[in-house]
Amino acid sequence: MAKSRPLQRSTALRSHAFPASQHPAPALGMSSDKALLPLGALMLAASMGAAAQGSAPETTMSTVTVKETAEIQGKDTLLLKKTTVGKGKQDIKDIPQSVTVFTEKLMADRNQDDFREVLRTTAGVTFLAGETGEEDVRLRGFSLGQAGDIYIDGMKDAPLIERDTFNHDRVEVLKGSASMLFGKGSTGGVVNQVNKAPLLIDQHEAAYTFGTGNSHRATGDFNFVTGENAAFRLNAMVQEADNYGAKQDKRGIAPTFAWGIGTRDEFSIGLYYLESKGRPTYNHPWRLSADGKINTTLPARNFYGLESDYTNTSSQYATLGHIHRFDDGGELNTRLRYGTYERDMLASTIGFQNSAITLGQINDSTVLTRYGSKGRMGESDVLQVQSDYSNTFNWGGKKHAVLTGVDYYDDDAKRNQNYANTT
């Protein structure tokens, strides 16, 4: 037993305790078997324990099912159940007012390329000719432009500009008092244009449309996935038309990049540019009939103006967005937008050379003349900051929704007085 202690130590520290010449000694060989017995017993016990564990029955966890409604694109459906016409995403059924949503698919099926064409099919919407040629959109009799009730992604849009649907995912119309959801505005309603956003799927689409009046229009919608939660989307449009002298040429492009899509913090940056050059139809010569009613005997399809008439508009803005999602389901949506909007118009006022001419005297030889012109120039530099917080919670056995936020809007407008001349 006196020898077993140093021999056990030499097994663990063999390379340090003995020279190499002493390893073949018989005493070392005889004692090594005894020294390894405890190690062999330990290995046998470990193998028996492993076998016992392997024979234990497996425990199967119960199946967990997770359900969530997929985000639906405007181009995939004619009907949407949610809207962002307010300061957050809501179910249409929860808004105690009439809401109409025009999805991208619906606008494409109807071939509605212009903002006015979309609204023209909405009950309660009418159009009046403005003093400087633009159309005044009215909802339930109230002017949307004058009240500032036209929005883009929930942020106020500039008035007196040309609009197009090439970058629209949908157009939402809320009828009724706008103050319920926006805290301002008229009692007519609100129109909200929702721009297309990057998606986590590669998809590309191009379209070409042609028609009478030398009308040609080409659009492109391209979406690229650039990372695990990042994507880039580009929309572009070119349109040309010359309908009996009333020309219109439009160019538009809208790139958007987003990262962190669907995560706790989502960021986006987008640019938008739309340029429109046209020749307006400012007025139509007319005469009063014997009973005092306005009578337009000249064909409406003709262009009553001069080749030098023009209406040029441009819209360009950049938008930065950030969405923070809290653990309790709350969401803080912050947007910063800066844009420049320009409008330059010169239109002729056309009438009969003989101001005393009667309806019975009008024929193919009747001479028309230009009585004067109407013009307007304007430029607006707009800065907007908007931050909205929304959340839902249960209290008192009922579900409640919280919606609050801040909104800053600064419009530095430079406009001349409406000018007119008779030369």
What are these regions (language model features)?
Residues V99, E131, G211-N214, K247-D249, ...:
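Short sequence motifs at beta-strands and strand-loop junctions characteristic
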Residues F210-N214, V238-D242, R251, Y273-K277, ...:
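Transmembrane beta-strands of outer-membrane beta-barrel pores
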Residues N229-F232, R264-I269, G329-L332, G397:
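Repeated loop/turn-to-beta-strand initiation elements of outer-membrane beta-barrel proteins
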Residues M48, A197, F224-E228, W259-T263, ...:
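Outer-membrane beta-barrel proteins
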Residues Q239-N243, T256-G260, R264-R325, G329, ...:
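Acidic/polar loop-and-plug regions of large Gram-negative outer-membrane beta-barrel proteins
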Residues K3, S62-I201:
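Acidic, small-polar-rich N-terminal luminal/periplasmic segments of exported/outer-membrane proteins
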Residues N167-D169, M180-P255, I261-E266, Q316:
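Outer-membrane beta-barrel translocator/receptor signature
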Residues L320-T340, Y371-T423:
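Face-selective signature of the C-terminal outer-membrane beta-barrel domain
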